[in-house]
Curated annotation (Swiss-Prot):
The keyword Ribosomal protein does not apply. Expressed by the venom gland. This is U8-ctenitoxin-Pr1a. It comes from the Eukaryota. It comes from Phoneutria reidyi. One of its GO terms (cellular component) is extracellular region. GO terms for molecular function: ion channel regulator activity; toxin activity. The lineage of its organism: Eukaryota, Metazoa, Ecdysozoa, Arthropoda, Chelicerata.
Length: 58
């Protein structure tokens, strides 16, 4: 299976669909940027080519 938008992920290949990426925003916390956690988000069209090369299941 694959992960829908908004689900927690570790890698682009886990996210459903060709155009969705695993996005890891950074948050300003305690005087430094900290990873806020990754979730599937809609990427741009160029993501598709990247995922087709990288991910066997796309």
């Amino acid at each position: 299976g694959c992960l829908d938008i908004g689900k927690t992920c570790k890698d682009d290949c886990e996210c459903c669909g060709c155009g969705n990426v695993c996005y890891c925003p950074f948050d300003w916390f305690g005087g430094s940027w900290q990873p806020f956690g990754c979730s599937c988000a809609y990427g741009l069209k160029y993501v598709c080519a990247h995922k087709q090369k990288k991910c066997p299941n796309v």
